[in-house]
UniProtKB/Swiss-Prot annotation:
Pfam families: ATP-synt_ab, ATP-synt_ab_C, ATP-synt_ab_N. This is ATP synthase subunit alpha, chloroplastic. Belongs to the ATPase alpha/beta chains family. One of its GO terms (biological process) is proton motive force-driven ATP synthesis. Keywords: ATP synthesis, ATP-binding, CF(1), Chloroplast, Hydrogen ion transport, Ion transport, Membrane, Nucleotide-binding, Plastid, Thylakoid, Translocase, Transport. It is a peripheral membrane protein. F-type ATPases have 2 components, CF(1) - the catalytic core - and CF(0) - the membrane proton channel. CF(1) has five subunits: alpha(3), beta(3), gamma(1), delta(1), epsilon(1). CF(0) has four main subunits: a, b, b' and c. The gene is atpA.
Amino acid sequence: MVTIRADEISKIIRERIEQYNTEVKIVNTGTVLQVGDGIARIYGLDEVMAGELVEFEEGTIGIALNLESKNVGVVLMGDGLMIQEGSSVKATGRIAQIPVSEAYLGRVINALAKPIDGRGEISASESRLIESPAPGIISRRSVYEPLQTGLIAIDSMIPIGRGQRELIIGDRQTGKTAVATDTILNQQGQNVICVYVAIGQKASSVAQVVNTLQERGAMEYTIVVAETADSPATLQYLAPYTGAALAEYFMYRERHTLIIYDDLSKQAQAYRQMSLLLRRPPGREAYPGDVFYLHSRLLERAAKLSSQLGEGSMTALPIVETQSGDVSAYIPTNVISITDGQIFLSADLFNAGIRPAINVGISVSRVGSAAQIKAMKQVAGKLKLELAQFAELEAFAQFSSDLDKATQNQLARGQRLRELLKQSQSAPLTVEEQIITIYTGTNGYLDSLEIGQVRKFLVELRAYLNTNKPQFKEIISSTKTFTGEAEVLLKEAIQEQMELFLLQEQVEKN
């Protein structure tokens, strides 16, 4: 017979009491009322915050956007096909954030900062909120350093500075993405981190951009954030903020960053879809009332930081697509008013073979001229005026048959200036090469050539200067001014190359 010893039992009970931990855990939960179209209506979740992440029973994450009296409207970060009516939802107490680190360079990720390039996980020890406040006035300084795009038309007449927001706007198929990718290629060796955000693009288009960057060695300093056309609207809406958070991480570490949003029209459409499904009242073009704030809070995060914060910068190049050149539509006017200028790409110019198809007349950079180097200012000062006068004359000349000699000369000069602005895709030029090109055109050295010979001559002239007069580039890069010595070298090179070129042309004819 087993004897029960009271002291042993009391000892066990005492130990159990000592081990007992009175931890009270309150979990904010709710119940799914209805789900569909990427939206869930939740009953409960009484203390949820606006923008808080919520977790469904089967693992899907959502963001609480609509806080109503009887229920909460949640947008899903996934298809939500496994979510059932009546299942439970719990609030996480966290606002959307992503991991950030140097390891993201060279990778392709989605809006949740998860890699989608099949090259394994990305290690990161820090994290940043996807939505963080923009730097205040005291935290900034005015734009003063240039960000070269490698495109003559932009760097000479619509200059961009580090920390600026410059809109690229135009119809579909006018080369907007090409301008952006050329700018990324031109940052090679400039110590600039680039972030390319693809929103609602075709997967094949994104793959093509990534391929171009890899071939040219530009992926080493680039992060691609991609949410393609088949992604849920929530993720397309979040992608630009994810890109901005990654760029900010580098900006606050005293680095220079360039971020491209391709394109914000698609983000606005995704946000419109979410808002209408959440039953928010529609406004102009069925967009919700806060669509301006959607873009302003994103683009205000681009800045040139003050010297106290390390002078890092984040330059934003948002892209907006217009419908048959209508710049007065809702989203284009909104983004134009937020940014520091716009580069307008014209379908007519593109179809006429002028590429990049930049309409210089209505493109503008509001703060970039302060960042332009002195050498470029000296050379390109009268280029915009001459092109504007040429465009006016050309329109007038269509109605007149007999033109005086001066007008004919001005038209001939204008045609050659327009020719020198043409560039092949993925062939950005250095500032020194741009100065050579513009000086040759504005000083009449191309007037004696046929229009068809202009580009060939300029390519040969740039190569000739690189090999025979390397000191020209040294003067420009060290002094940042177009000195008398540099001008003498350039004039000599133009005359020597012109003689060679005309001889070659004569030999080819014979």
